[in-house]
A protein has these predicted regions:
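Catalytic toxin/effector domains delivered as secreted proteins or via bacterial secretion systems
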Residues: 1-54
């Protein structure tokens, strides 16, 4: 399923939160691109994606 960490519908931005390490960050971007594609198909427009690390 798809479970982005946070979605801001007012700015069309999808956020994913991942630990600061290369493997997790790579996985985060992969998820974000998938979410972006799905959101653009479902809701239209251009969606921004942001990977936040901790």
């Amino acid at each position: 399923g798809i479970r982005p960490d946070f979605v801001d519908f007012s700015t069309k931005t999808i956020y994913e939160l991942k630990p600061f390490n290369p493997k997790a960050m790579q996985q985060g971007w992969k998820q974000l691109y998938k979410y972006q594609s799905l959101f653009q198909q479902k809701y239209g427009g251009t969606w921004n994606i942001i990977l936040d690390t901790y």
